[in-house]
Amino acid sequence: MTFASLSTPTTAAELRYLALGDSYTIGEGVAESARWPALLAQQLRADGIAMSAPRIIAQTGWTTDELSAAMDAAGPLGEWDFVSLLIGVNNQYRGRSVEDFRSEFSGLLTRAIQLARGRTDRVLVLAIPDWGVTPFAEGRNRANIATEVDAFNAVKRAICASRGVAFVDISAVSRKFGGQPTHLADDGLHPGPALYLEWARAARSVARARLPGGMGREWGGE
């Protein structure tokens, strides 16, 4: 999929949302409206929070350093009311070291906090899902994939805790549903709309506690 840096005009009252990531953020294989950042924004609006549609800087296959380079290339990104970050699966997939990831992820998180006007409470990080449960991993060592993904996520969790940034662990729900055809895109690897909805629900409960606004109706995905 081609690089995406998408945005929707906002009104003065809307909170500006920047979503940073890779294929999981751009929503490889699903419609734009089914991407988890788009679903999260919809859910937060249902809660009475004036959230804009997200600007997305993401591309399938990106590693931490490639996302950072793309942010540089995007020019001045300005300031945002809310920033999400989901990155790292391609570092693991390509066999890159956890130690290199630690340094690069820490740098990305610093940038995300800066983009959120220095407010750590306005940054949200999602865990890397375990792609080893998907049909794409057939013939591979699924146990090793799970162990490696857990190691990368442990780094993310620890860095977020040290910075006071929310870490949303989607590991359990991804392992529960990530291998089911009803929750997969056609490629047998990436999540489908149903799984992205689960991710958005997990992120919603964390995000809405950190954003100004009221509580609205419960989101049923309609």
Give residue spans per PLM region.
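Serine-esterase "nucleophile elbow" of acetyl-processing enzymes
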Residues: 3-60, 70-79
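Alpha-helical cap/lid subdomain in secreted, periplasmic
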Residues: 50, 69-221
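Active-site-proximal substrate-binding core of FAD-dependent oxidoreductases
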Residues: 66
